[in-house]
Amino acid sequence: MLLRLILKSGLLAVIAFSESVTFRFDEAPINNIVYSSSFWLSSSAAIDPSRENRFIFQVGYCTIFNQQNNNYWSYPNVDMGLKITKNLSVTTKAYGFSIQEEAPQVLGAGIQYYFGTNNDTLDWSACIQRVDLKGLEHFRISSITFDIRKWISLRSTRLRIGVGSNFFKENSYLMGDNIPTKIEGQINFLGLDITMPLSIFILGIEARMNADRVLTTIFLQKEIF
């Protein structure tokens, strides 16, 4: 009951306080836009190694709280995953959307490797993911994310907890005295996911915490076969 309440409260908070993100350098601080965009790209599909289904489709609504500016920006998330073997999954992101005058495109892929004390107890996962953000007027981003997680069972709820790092390179199209031609950076984070069954779906909330930003995602996952 407590975890269900946390999920519901998180969803209400995201809807109540978030606002549409901007990808334009003339509307917000450049570093804020770039770092928040790359942090968003670091999200990955929560593929549970204990489940038997091979293909998953996951959609979510991500909100990033920028502590320096005290603002919330929201982004969509779409992930797909396919279990190749018991120990290995491949993931992909390939979607676009329209916001204001922009049409961002998210393209990427990754792998998740599962391991444990023996082949029957796969309660650890290691993930590497490359994701690019294209289609914008002012910049593009290429990012690589590494993370390692521990899966924990709590009754019907599953937890995924761990740490990770996001490395990115941004190239600017817009020229100006105060606009760098490129920005490179690294975002280290702590991660915690909570998932639980909801009818034929899996409902989850993801949190990624950094010293400057907090990312929260509400997602719905469907296992196809």
Q: Language-model segments: which ranges?
A:
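Sec-dependent signal peptide recognition
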Residues: 2-12
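Sec/Tat signal peptide C-region and signal peptidase I cleavage site
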Residues: 14-18
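Disordered, low-complexity tails and leader-like regions
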Residues: 2, 122, 200-201, 213
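Glycine- and aromatic-enriched membrane insertion/assembly motifs of diderm outer-membrane
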Residues: 62-122, 129-130
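Membrane-embedded beta-strand positions in outer-membrane beta-barrel channels/transporters
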Residues: 77-79, 108-110, 145-147, 189-193, ...
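Outer-membrane beta-barrel domain signature
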Residues: 76-77, 82, 94-96, 101-102, ...
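Outer-membrane beta-barrel transmembrane domain signature
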Residues: 19-56, 60-63, 68-71, 136-202, ...
